[in-house]
Amino acid sequence: KFDGAIEDYKTALKYEPECALWRDILYGSDKQLFWYCDPYMRACVNMDQGGAIVDLRPYAAKLEWPVGIGTKHVQDASYPFLIQEKYRAGYFTHYAGEGTVRSAKLSYKGEEVDLCLCPTHAHFSQEGKTRILTLDPVTIEFRDLTVKLQTKEYFEEGSSNIKIERNILEMSDPTAEVTLNEYMVACYGTTEYSEDMSHITLKIDGPEEKTINYEYKCREEGVVGAAEVSAVIPEIETRVSMTASDANAEGYVKEGYAFSPMFTLGYRKTISDKEVFATWLNLAKAN
């Protein structure tokens, strides 16, 4: 090394996000996962669930989390999550309420399809400091309408957010309109057991301001033209929010209850053929 015959890996190593698009080859399932990690978050995207975010750690809070004898965390050194499909289940436990996940639903004439039920594959690219996941289009079949939809997910270095873009590529009836519901179900913690949610505040900012102080009453509020929907979680010093590209979209927040304590943030919008709708999931330190 000192003679210059070999390159020291550490001297050339840059501080940049770590990411990996992983495909299962061990069991031959052909499933794909994408992991992204930077100083603001760690996230996992599951292509077998239509590009849903199934793991999210809000590093933006920069928690002090002492571990060991004499601290509040004698053994548990895990950083708290907002979404975790193993400990907080995921889409496939919705029979018991809702598991934690960041996904979207399409509705048409009383029928509803969650993109978690639309397995696909993704391709990775990078433009400047933005890592991009481009998912293969999925076809959603309603009783009398077929919709072809493509998802792109953007991870911009240093932005502390994830942009998710839905593009309606084709409809069997070009004049039809469907309702797109972009949602995030979350519940903080480090284990499968729920933490106390009673100090969480859910809020909608926009033409009308709505606030829910968490009391496990399963309440919901919505505002058309919402600028932002958010949740503040004091215990982990985290503020998580969603914003949308369309100023006319309806933002909503939903409170959980004792046996399904997760909160929900989301946007609903009527969308038509060839239309694109984007939302951002934003993470910040609460104070």
Sequence positions of predicted segments:
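Acidic (Asp/Glu-rich), glycine- and aromatic
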Residues: 55-59, 138-152, 157-206
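C-terminal domain-boundary segment and adjacent tail
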Residues: 1-32
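Short acidic-hydrophobic surface loop/beta-edge motif
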Residues: 34-38, 202, 218, 229-231
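Extended recognition/assembly regions associated with phosphoester-bond processing machinery
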Residues: 27, 39-40
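Broad, structure-driven detector of short, well-ordered beta-strand segments within folded domains
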Residues: 40-47, 147-155, 227-246
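Short, surface-exposed beta-strand/loop "edge" segments at domain boundaries and coil↔beta transitions
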Residues: 42-44, 62-67, 137-149, 173-177, ...
